[in-house]
Amino acid sequence: MFRSTATVAAATAMGLLTATGHGSLAIAQGTTGSNAVVVDGTNFALNGASMSYVFHANSTTGDLVSDHFGATISGAIPAPKEPAVNGWVGMPGRIRREFPDQGRGDFRIPAVRIRQTAGYTVSDLQYQGHEVVDGKPALPGLPATFGEAGDVTTLVVHLYDNYSAVAADLSYSVFPEFDAVVRSVNVTNKGKGNITIENLASLSVDFPLEDLDLVSLRGDWAREANRERRRVEYGIQGFGSSTGYSSHLHNPFFALVHPSTTESQGEAWGFNLVYTGSFSAQVEKGSQGLTRALIGFNPDQLSWNLGPGETLTSPECVSVYSKDGIGGMSRKFHRLYRKHLIRSKFATSDRPPLLNSWEGVYFDFNQSSIETLAEQSAALGIRLFVMDDGWFGDKYPRTSDNAGLGDWTPNPDRFPNGLEPVVEEITNLTVNDTSAEKLRFGIWVEPEMVNPNSSLYREHPDWALHAGAYARTERRNQLVLNLALPEVQEYIIDFMTDLLNSADISYIKWDNNRGIHEAPSPSTDHEYMLGVYRVFDTLTARFPDVLWEGCASGGGRFDAGVLHYFPQIWTSDNTDGVDRVTIQFGTSLAYPPSAMGAHLSAVPNHQTGRTVPLEFRAHVAMMGGSFGLELDPATLQDDPDVPELIQMAEKVNPLVLNGDLYRLRLPEESQWPAALFVAEDGSQAVLFYFQLSPNVNHAAPWVRLQGLDPEASYTVDGDKTYTGATLMNLGLQYTFDTEYGSKVVFLERQ
């Protein structure tokens, strides 16, 4: 419901805020949902458990000016030294602006660029009013965080350009428990002519004079999520994606931290775009020493026409503040996403250990061999069997990556009676031969793609993305279907509905193996993503009991947009245990480990050629919310350790899904990385400790734990008992007998 600004008088009377003039106000203390947003005239305070975000509207210019984003402040705050209106053009670099427009003397990177009918890009968006909403409205057609009154409060600030009749509504949703402010923007054309949006940031924030470091995630296929940290220098630095999806190259996340900030100490500001398409993230340190940070649409991929009365809504950006280092920032993202982003029923429920057929057999299988693989999997204790690529295609059978995409009917040579008999056979298998539980069945699809060698492409070549008469560039022998077209969306929804109704399918792995080329317009990327989101929204709502996993050649779409619909994502096509330590640690900067798909694969590894002990590979895979095997199960039938490792993965899983992650030692800083998962109530914990290279005459260092109750006693692996204070201030030490050593240690509070 809407709360009118009349509530401000009541808040002032209660002493929650006091107008002090010139853009100053006192900040609410002891924040609850009722005072997460406090307003006094045109002064605004957004309050978290340990965070304050304060800004005001300049009474002369109507511009929104930032006062503070950081640790909680109280009492009156000093007014920023702003130039008089006549000095505006000469001194724009001194002003910390909330939503910087273009063309009026601020030469730093803008948050919005609007081309008017006459051709110019000048905007003058001034404060017009505001409203406060209990709860959080949904974003039309886009993934978004959610919450009820008491969980989240939303401030909407209305800006208006009197000359162009353009309105901008800035949304600030405050989740106090997580020190999170979620921002998005609506731009509406209220004039009579057409306008074009050429740039729109979901978030812009200006920081005062100080040194900052920029932390981000870079990579490529099979080496995603490498942590990058560099000093913010004068000028513009940034990154993004122009691939049509969030990409392996750069993740739509970054953090700003003080140079002295570590994993466990210091201030950190995290920013994560809830979006799966092309994006841009930029940070600029201006001549006056102020630092501006923005993230939103990639302007090179945006030219959005707005006719009279039409609106463009930006994706939202989640920003969190931490006074407990980068690790504290990550834990706030993780808790927020588990509770208020991932809408699946599986967000916090145990995931079944699975076996995926891909690296075990690739395209070489038939009904009989698949049934044998499933039987061998069930005997090991696997609870979900997944048939990957190669099961479909009639006239153009999918026996390699050269044909079949788009023709989503079972290959009659491999499955002469369709999927139902094989699925029935598999789902009648008993797990472990002693359990009453039956094996579940899952299947791989890549609905957004089409092979030219397919019946679908022969019938609808116009459904593939193309730019006029230019040649259509193939990648992995495939093209991209244009999901901006409603008929393509309906085709995918219909065949997926038929597939899921045809047999007892419990799991879908949704893949995407290439980016967008030959886009017909600069706005194709966003139109495409809106179509993808409509398909995701329809299917996940229609089949809520199906466990959906996202994939894009591994982690090419590991983003908060996909997580809104799918509770887990395949983290990387690289299943090498050593490489996965770095990839999974990096991914956890913004995304909860509960969302990571991680599998134990064969050796030598199919991507790196490296041979790593079975136990090490299994322990690394246990750190993902979806543990699985990616190999031929026949190679494991005589290994007694495998069923025990699967049982250990199931024991670990609840803590990985719902616990707080502490990265105790980083793989880029030490050859002995370590991580600890602690139950939210502190009753249990599990330590993962690795050795990444051989060491002669060098003992592994002690590892200090975090997040425990210092006054409580903890039993370590059911043996020795130590206080939380001892474990955190002294720690534990282990020795490793092999080049790639690993330990998984369970702790339980007494």
From Swiss-Prot:
One of its GO terms (biological process) is glycosylation. Its EC number is 3.2.1.22. Its cofactor is Mg(2+); NAD(+). It is an enzyme of class 3 (hydrolase). The keyword Translocase does not apply. Its main location: secreted. CDD domains: GH36. Glycans are attached at N58, N162, N186, N194, N366, N428, N432, N453. Keywords: Carbohydrate metabolism, Glycoprotein, Glycosidase, Hydrolase, Magnesium, NAD, Polysaccharide degradation, Secreted, Signal. Optimum temperature is 52 degrees Celsius. Residues 1-26 form the signal peptide. Pfam families: Glyco_hydro_36C, Glyco_hydro_36N, Melibiase. GO terms for molecular function: alpha-galactosidase activity. It catalyses: Hydrolysis of terminal, non-reducing alpha-D-galactose residues in alpha-D-galactosides, including galactose oligosaccharides, galactomannans and galactolipids. Optimum pH is 3.5. The keyword Iron does not apply. The active site is at D511 (nucleophile), D573 (proton donor). Homotetramer. Hydrolyzes a variety of simple alpha-D-galactoside as well as more complex molecules such as oligosaccharides and polysaccharides. Active on paranitrophenyl-alpha-galactoside, raffinose, locust bean gum and gum guar. Belongs to the glycosyl hydrolase 36 family. This is Alpha-galactosidase C. The gene is aglC.
